[in-house]
Amino acid sequence: MRRIVIAIILVLAGATLAAQPAQGSFTQTWTKGPDWLRDGVIYQVYPSSYKDSDGNGIGDIRGVISELDYIESLGVRAIWFNPLFVSGWIDGGYDVIDFYRVDPRFGTNNDLVELIRKAHDKGIKVMLDLVAGHTSDKHPWFLQSAEDTNLQYSDYYIWSDRLPDKKAEQDLETMLKDPDYMQNTLGKWMKSGYPRDKYYYKNFYACQPALNYGFANPDPDHPWEQGVDAPGPRAVRQELKDIIAFWYDKGVDGFRVDMASSLVKNDKDKKEILNLWREVREWSDKNYPDHVLMAEWGSPKYCLAAGYNVDMDLNNTNGHNRRLYFDRKHQADGGVYFSLDGGQPSVRDLYGNPWPEDKIDRTTTPADMLKEYYDYFTDCVESTSEMGYFATISGNHDHLRINVGPRNTPEQLKVMLSWILTMPLPILYYGDEIGMRSLVDMPNVEGANHNGKERAGARTPMQWNSGVNAGFSTCSPDDIYLPVCPEWTPANSYPQYLAWKNEYACGRAGTTAPGNITVESQDDDPNSLLNWTRSLIALRKEHGALWADSRFIPIFNAENPYPMVYLRTDGEESILVALNPTAESRKLSLSSEISAFRHETAGMKGNVAPLLSTGKASYRCTSSCDNLTLGPVSGIVIRL
């Protein structure tokens, strides 16, 4: 037990780090952002898949308007939309053709303004996705930049008459051999085929030429590398502000910025990208106070020092939370903390096929997984607590949902969402509140699948009811954006998948079976995952200890990593969260840990009471918690 006490005291002592500037940080002190971020949950909506109002098979703004009462019922503070702007639709809207106009498939600018007004009437903020780093190759800026004689836009992009090295040549040669090379991410350069120079610099797909924000320490032997203060990069920076201002003037409350850390090239110490975003933040604070900038960065010490209000804990391959959710590399090399088997090594992929033995990590333990994440997360939160917030996501459009593989029952998902929704600032991906599943073998719609990574399975239509297309659209199933929860039929499926199919799976031809994963089937069921989600969000609003600016204090036991236990406190109130995602009962005594916590913080005020519980969980807490027992797949939230 002594090890646990020491861990808590070290975390408490770490609070002094909050006042220290982060590495590469700035002397400017940023406000953390508007008050709604403190107790808020942000709801992410992939607009093509949420609700179709006109029967064409693609979700739209008027469809979202029709479901604002439902979104309000969740208790969320804001909606974040994936890109709504006019797009070439090679990469799900992230190849923008016009930043100033809503794509006609979603409606009009006036429709979006109406949505914003009606959302505001319900106390819900609206945030848009800003693709700041690149455009579509069909964007007028790029087409004019590609002309020999154009002057205004000639340096909005990065052009060269030669490739920088052999590797770039090999990458381009390999990419062009791909029949679908426009959706190939290999390398950084693309053959232009335009009147001017032979090659342009791309960010992701070939259809996404990088905007020119300049290079840090440009190489004089590389004439395409302009400094950040060259006329082209300065003009692009002004365009960025103009786009933000245009939508703020229409009522938008903030932006989530795509690839926020990579706008300036060759910026290893992030000095220039921090300067860029500080300039934007100072301009925004002066002209549009109380608006929010949220980044896809994954490093809050840099992100928040750059002036962002929120950074996101990413579920990417190297993300620290991936070991808790999905394993390090798409369930390829070890165990998963939030699993029935207690973090045993993953031996199969998502299709149920066995992994080769040499790819299975049999050395990493659940304690290793949890300790790694606790160390990372507490450092991120404590060292940036004066600057902004670090958000925890349930899933998103690029990564797996939490309902994946053998983690597929409502009970398991309640435990998972208990973790996410008691963290400092949660972002809830649409459909996760009802347990929608990550699917495989989905069609590659609009660049969703690339390099062996299937993103389409997390973008399937919202499942509203048991009607045609799960209530998403009245269209023919042949015209739907993505299939609605098709039957799970791969060979060698897990037994859990077969059980899931029988109990939860959708039927064929765009219909859903009674009792399936839908809003309709869960709305009035007090024991449903949907209502558990609502209860957790309501609990956040009622208890300041769970707010974004309250402390997160892990209780770690190397010999007994289950149940997961942590404290949230605001100095006035303290809440203990204990979660057991495994198939076995788990017991833990916390008397010495709680005593240490009380001594250091005076954080336990008496009136100990359970606030929420799922599964079979019991405790004995008076002056301390000397007996905490959690049955299989259970969790409890206790006010201390």
Describe the residue ranges of each PLM region.
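Acidic/aromatic-lined carbohydrate-recognition and catalytic surfaces
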Residues: Q20-Q238, D249, R256, A260-N309, ...
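Beta-strand-rich binding/interaction modules
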Residues: S585-T614
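Positively charged n-region of N-terminal signal peptides that target proteins for export
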Residues: M1-I4
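Conserved alpha/beta catalytic core and glycan-binding cleft of carbohydrate-active enzymes
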Residues: D137-D178, W277, R281-P461, S466-N469
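Alpha-helical packing segments of well-folded alpha/beta enzyme cores
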Residues: E67, D111, L115, V236-W247, ...
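Loop/helix patches that line or flank the sugar-binding groove of alpha-linked glycan CAZymes
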Residues: L37, N287, G307, P345-D349, ...
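Hydrophobic h-region of N-terminal signal peptides that target proteins for export
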Residues: V11-A18
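C-terminal beta-strand-rich structural cap/linker in extracellular carbohydrate-active enzymes
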Residues: C621-L640
